[in-house]
Amino acid sequence: MRDYRQSRKYTMKKLLKIFLAALLLFSFVSMTGILFVFQTFFARFDKKTGYLTYEDVEEQYDRTVFTFPSGKNNLKGYLYGEANNQGLVVLVHGLGGGAESYLAETLYFVDQGWKVFAFDCTGSFGSEGSGIGGLSQALLDLRAALDYIRKDSALKELPLMLYGHSMGGYAVTSVLNYDYDITAVVSVSGFNTPLDAMVERSSQYIGILAYLEYPFLWGYQALMYGSTAFVQAIDGINRSDTPVMIIHGEKDRSVTYEGSGIIAYRDKIKNPNVVYKTCWIRFRNDHKNLNVSEDAYLYRKEVKEGYKALSLKYHNKVPREVQSGYDQTIDALRASKLDTAFMENMNEFFESNLNNRYVNRTE
């Protein structure tokens, strides 16, 4: 009996050692994998060709270029419509893009009488930074932009509207957790927290393993951004009575409608001044196509098929000069044409709350 107990004790110790070794190996592989994911998905994004650029419209629209600090990096900012005095729309771009990726929206707001303040987030286009770092960076960069506006004698006097898409849609709502005088917010395809968005997106590639990696994602985010990593959009929305329009595509696969999207938390949002808009039309219900015209949507599909054909022809190694030549054939204005009704809906939301703001100030 004594030998049996000793043998059993030895076996348990051996199993425990194996378990601890496996746990350490899993932890090491997990942290290495997460580091790789962050370095890959949040790498630097530089300007692409084949889309609408300021050079296409510079004769019709003025623009002032400037820089402002965000942490250790200087960000590139752009001010459009300097003669407009209705208010200031601050535009925050999504992951993989820059301010110029949203030039069509910028020019639309300028045409409606707004000044527009757009900027390239850290590690994007004209801004400094070896990479974006993570989704929380957009919130830090927006705060830096708003601090810059606070110090500008002309801009700080204007009613402030926020417009953001995807990562930017998170930033413009989560920034409501802080003390800024915001008149109204439009969030398009925004997520509630960076962690939710990353776990959801990862699960589409590696399934249930994404949830096993949750503690490591949490820890890495905490190391990178501290408490900022866990700022929730819905907490910002509920913190005040700032009017917010939340727009989301029913078939969004990047930030899902009933998953990580802000709109999925609508039953937890108590702010009475929140408006929800669901996009369900076939060609305008995904993550990136909510505000484009039907013609632009169909043309973009045509362009995408052209890219696929080139990729097949050159076995996924398209020569740079061939890629550049194809880009030059793209009609950037046509590909960027917006859906007028969609844009008018947002503009009317801004204008109606602009009027309410002035009413409230006189009461």
Language model features with spans:
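Alpha/beta-hydrolase active-site loop
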Residues: 132-153
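The serine-hydrolase catalytic nucleophile loop
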Residues: 95-108, 121, 258
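Conserved alpha/beta-hydrolase
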Residues: 106-128
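Short beta-strand/loop motif that positions the catalytic acidic residue
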Residues: 240, 246-248, 252
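C-terminal catalytic histidine-bearing segment of alpha/beta-hydrolase fold enzymes
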Residues: 272-363
